[in-house]
Amino acid sequence: MEWIKQSGMLLASGNIVDYPGQTLDELAEDILLMKELEISWAPVIPYLSAANTPLAAEGGRGSQEKTLREIAILRLMMPEVNITAQQPGENPENGLADTEGNLKALNAGANMLFADMLPDALAKSFSVVDNRTTLGLDHIKKMADLAGMQLLYK
């Protein structure tokens, strides 16, 4: 890890929150490690089961509340870190690109959104999460407007 930082590369580390069997102590340890590593980016998402994976049988979704709390804690502990706002909302059909969930994450302290540029035909074949939804820059512009944030991109 030190070599990565010394080379000038940015270091990212994040969490999948509330996967089956995960404890609050483990989440706390992860947060402290992220601070110790002085990361520049923290992708934090709730657990979403995906079909045909070992944890699929355990089903369920990770807690949005726990995920939003982790985002808020990270923002307080590391004001300069970039935190993603890719959060599901109440409708699982929207996957990680949900307006309600994204806005809650931005309000909790997240400051980054992804533009998923994967073509729809490929997205259906790439099943890291079920119901993957690809939304581009229009979604990001909408989210920034709803959150009262200014977009900075090149």
Which role fits each region the language model picked out?
Residues 1-16:
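Radical SAM/AdoMet-radical enzyme domain recognition
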Residues 16-31, 89-97:
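Active-site glycine- and acidic-residue-rich loops that bind
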Residues 12-20, 50-56:
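Active-site-proximal beta-alpha loop/turn segments in soluble metabolic enzymes
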Residues 35-154:
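Auxiliary Fe-S-binding modules of radical SAM enzymes
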Residues 1, 23, 27, 67:
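Aromatic/hydrophobic pocket-lining residues that form the small-molecule binding cavity
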